[in-house]
C-alpha cells in the first residue's frame, strides 16, 4: 500500500506553517494544502519555496475568513466574511450563486499560482466537496490537478484521486494506533490511502481563528516519531505525495 499524509491548513497561522514544515522535514508528511486567504499566507509561500520537495495543493475554502474577491453577495455575511462552517454553508446553499463559487475558488487558485507556487491537488476546508463538487471537478480539469477523494462521488473521470480518504486521524483519533489500524486494513493491497492531518505548533493566531487547536501539537509529535516511521518501514508502506499519483 501507499500512504499520502496530507497536512491541511498550511498558512492558517505561523505555528501551523512551522508545524507542517517540521512534519515534512523530520516526519512522514509530503503533501500540504495552502489556504489562499490565510493570515500566514506569505510565510507559507516563503517556506514552500525554500522546501521544493514539499508538495503543495490548494485548500479551497468558502467557510473560513474573508474571500479573495469582493462583492460576493451569496457567499458572505453582512461583514463580508464567509459563513463559518459546513452546516451554515449547506443551509444557505439554495441561495448560493455557483458562478460566484467558481469565481472565488479560481481567484484562490490564481493567488497561489501568482505567488510562484506549483499546485498538484485540490481539497477543501471543512470538507465542503459534496456541496461544490461540480465546480471543483471543472477546476481540477482546467488546472490539470488531482483532488481529494470523497464518498459522494463514485466516478471521478480522468481526474486522479487516492483510492481512499481517511479522516480517523483527527481529534480523539490522533494516535499511532489509528494509523497502525489503517495500515493493517490495507496492507498487501495496491491501495493509495490519503490520511488527513493537521499538524501545527500552537500560537495565538491559531487559538483565535480555529476551534481545532490542542490535538495539532500531538499530531506533530506522532507524524515525526521514529516509532511511526519504523513501523511503516517494517510494513513496507510507501509514503508518497499527490505529485506521485
Swiss-Prot record:
- A GO term, aspect molecular function: metal ion binding
Assembly and partners are described as:
Homodimer.
GO BP, sorted A to Z:
polysaccharide catabolic process
Family to which the UniProt record says this protein belongs: Belongs to the YdjC deacetylase family.
| One of the Pfam families matching this protein, by short name | YdjC
Q: PANTHER family, from UniProt?
A: CARBOHYDRATE DEACETYLASE (PTHR31609:SF1), YDJC DEACETYLASE FAMILY MEMBER (PTHR31609)
InterPro entries in UniProt? COD_ChbG_bac (IPR022948), Glyco_hydro/deAcase_b/a-brl (IPR011330), YdjC-like (IPR006879)
Binding site residues for Mg(2+):
59, 125
| E.C. no | 3.5.1.-
State the protein's name. Answer: Carbohydrate deacetylase
Top-rank lineage group of the source organism: Bacteria
Q: Does the keyword Nucleotide-binding apply?
A: no
| The keyword Acetylation belongs to this UniProt entry's keyword annotation | no
Q: Which residues form the signal peptide?
A: none
HAMAP family to which the protein is assigned, alphabetical: COD (MF_01246)
Its required cofactor(s), as named, are: Mg(2+)
List the top taxonomic levels of the source: Bacteria, Bacillati, Bacillota, Bacilli, Bacillales
The entry's keywords: Carbohydrate metabolism, Hydrolase, Magnesium, Metal-binding
Species this chain originates from: Listeria monocytogenes serotype 4a (strain HCC23)
Job description of the protein: Probably catalyzes the deacetylation of acetylated carbohydrates an important step in the degradation of oligosaccharides.
**SUPFAM superfamilies given in the database record:** Glycoside hydrolase/deacetylase
Name of the top EC class for this enzyme:
hydrolase
Amino acid at each position: 500500500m501507499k500512504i499520502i499524509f496530507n497536512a491541511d491548513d498550511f498558512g492558517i497561522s505561523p505555528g501551523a506553517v512551522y508545524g507542517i514544515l517540521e512534519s515534512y522535514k523530520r516526519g512522514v508528511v509530503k503533501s500540504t494544502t495552502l489556504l489562499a486567504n490565510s493570515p500566514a499566507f506569505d510565510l507559507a509561500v516563503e517556506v514552500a519555496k525554500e522546501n521544493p520537495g514539499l508538495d503543495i495543493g490548494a485548500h479551497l475554502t468558502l467557510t473560513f475568513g474573508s474571500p479573495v474577491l469582493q462583492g460576493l453577495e451569496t457567499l458572505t455575511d453582512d461583514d463580508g466574511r464567509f459563513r463559518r462552517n459546513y452546516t451554515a454553508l449547506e443551509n444557505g446553499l439554495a441561495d448560493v450563486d455557483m458562478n460566484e463559487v467558481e469565481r472565488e475558488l479560481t481567484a484562490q487558485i490564481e493567488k497561489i499560482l501568482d505567488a510562484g507556487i506549483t499546485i498538484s491537488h485540490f481539497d477543501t476546508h471543512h470538507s465542503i466537496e459534496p456541496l461544490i463538487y461540480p465546480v471543483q471537478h471543472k477546476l481540477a480539469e482546467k488546472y490539470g490537478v488531482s483532488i481529494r477523494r470523497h464518498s459522494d462521488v463514485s466516478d471521478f473521470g480522468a481526474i486522479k484521486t487516492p483510492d481512499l480518504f481517511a479522516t480517523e486521524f483527527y481529534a480523539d483519533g490522533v494516535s499511532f494506533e489509528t494509523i497502525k489500524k489503517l495500515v493493517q486494513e490495507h496492507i498487501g493491497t495496491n491501495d493509495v490511502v490519503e490520511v488527513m492531518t493537521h499538524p501545527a505548533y500552537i500560537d495565538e493566531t491559531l487559538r483565535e481563528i480555529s476551534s481545532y487547536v490542542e490535538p495539532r501539537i500531538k499530531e506533530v509529535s506522532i507524524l515525526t516519531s521514529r516509532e511511526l516511521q519504523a513501523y511503516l518501514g517494517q510494513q513496507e508502506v510507501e509514503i508518497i505525495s499527490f505529485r506521485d499519483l
